[in-house]
Swiss-Prot record:
PROSITE patterns: CARBAMOYLTRANSFERASE. Catalyzes the condensation of carbamoyl phosphate and aspartate to form carbamoyl aspartate and inorganic phosphate, the committed step in the de novo pyrimidine nucleotide biosynthesis pathway. Carbamoyl phosphate binds at residues 60-61, 110, 138, 141, 266-267. L-aspartate binds at residues 88, 171, 225. InterPro entries: Asp/Orn_carbamoyltranf_P-bd, Asp/Orn_carbamoylTrfase, Asp/Orn_carbamoylTrfase_sf, Asp_carbamoyltransf, Asp_carbamoyltransf_Asp/Orn-bd. HAMAP family: Asp_carb_tr (MF_00001). It comes from Rhizorhabdus wittichii (strain DSM 6014 / CCUG 31198 / JCM 15750 / NBRC 105917 / EY 4224 / RW1). This is Aspartate carbamoyltransferase catalytic subunit. Pathway: Pyrimidine metabolism; UMP biosynthesis via de novo pathway; (S)-dihydroorotate from bicarbonate: step 2/3. It comes from the Bacteria. The keyword Nucleotide-binding does not apply. It is an enzyme of class 2 (transferase). Keywords: Pyrimidine biosynthesis, Transferase. Heterododecamer (2C3:3R2) of six catalytic PyrB chains organized as two trimers (C3), and six regulatory PyrI chains organized as three dimers (R2).
Length: 316
């Protein structure tokens, strides 16, 4: 740990200072060129074991962390929960103790329950990185989104960012609100009343139920999918009606700033929260760039969180 980033784990954006977030973004910048080069290998994590323990289905995030670990030279092990003791009734604490006994040097965790990552982090001896826990947080997604915005816009402070869609069930929304407001952006959240968390203003976001009003003059428009797997009731009449009221179309995008950036954490539901013509726009869409920045951000986080274990000077 050092003054630049004095945290042992990265379980969320909450509690991070502006300079700590900016430090991680700056660290990520150095990996972008490597990832675009023909040879993409760095061996600074050689000999270290990274366990990706995903208790919830994932393709994109798991692949991104696996690529990040391997490009840094780590031995990467992906834990398949379907074949694990968790399916046989093992408690989360037992799983944490088992992982700890395997002497991993870093554990990346995704779990369907909010707070599960922190519980495991409290029980293990190595750094833990949150890859998404329930509705709580998804810190590396917020970091890669902030990096994408900074690279495309040149800054974050003073920008108006509209986060639109299923805010209620979105850990991405929560982490982005925390990161972007901490870095000086004005964050709007746009959703129907049934998909808007209560007292969202306490997080520093400005709520809108009217999609058009929320888009007015926005510098960045971030769309979120409907998380049907987290819905246990009738939150909206139908995907078709949601699209009619809250789908981002070329016409609606005209209400935002002329050079507004379009973002989406994926996976997208084309024709529901966003049309293909907007998602694939050659100059305004940054969706594929977000994926690219994700690998760089995760490489930076793996590097930073293991510096103490590797004996890097200044990281006692």
């Amino acid at each position: 740990m050092s003054a630049s980033f004095p945290h042992r784990h990265l379980t969320g954006i909450y509690g991070l200072q502006p300079h700590e977030i900016l430090f991680l973004l700056d660290e990520a910048e150095q990996w972008i060129a490597l990832n675009r080069a023909t040879s993409k290998h760095d061996d600074r994590l050689a000999g270290l074991t990274l366990i990706n323990a995903f208790f919830e289905n994932s393709t994109r995030t798991l692949l991104s962390f696996e690529i990040a670990g391997k490009r840094l030279g780590a031995d990467v092990v992906n834990m398949q929960v379907g074949a694990s003791s968790v399916k046989k009734g093992e408690t989360l604490i037992d799983t944490a103790m088992t992982l700890n006994a395997m002497r991993a040097d870093m554990i990346v965790i995704r779990h369907q329950s909010s707070g599960a990552v922190q519980l495991i982090a409290d029980k293990v001896d190595c750094p833990v990185l949150n890859a998404g826990d329930g509705r709580h947080e998804h810190p590396t997604q917020a970091l890669l989104d902030a990096l994408t915005i900074r690279r495309r816009k040149g800054r974050i402070a003073g920008l108006v960012v509209a986060i639109c869609g299923d805010i209620l069930h979105s850990r991405v929304a929560r982490s982005n609100i925390l990161a972007l407001t901490t870095l000086g952006a004005e964050v709007r959240v746009v959703a129907p009343p049934t998909l808007m968390p209560a007292a969202i203003e306490r997080m520093g976001a400005v709520p809108f139920h009217d999609f058009d009003a929320g888009l007015d003059g926005a510098d960045v428009v971030m769309m979120l999918r409907l998380q049907n797997e987290r819905m246990d009731g009738a939150y909206l009449p139908s995907p078709r009606e949601f699209h009619a009221l809250y789908g981002l179309t070329p016409e609606r995008l005209e209400r935002a700033a002329p050079d507004a950036l379009v973002m989406h954490p994926g996976p997208m539901n084309r024709g529901v929260e966003i049309t293909s013509s907007v998602a694939d726009h050659p100059s305004r869409s940054a969706i594929t760039e977000q994926v690219e920045m994700g690998v760089a951000v995760r490489m930076a986080c793996l590097d930073v969180l293991t510096r103490r274990r590797r004996g890097v000077e200044g990281w006692a």
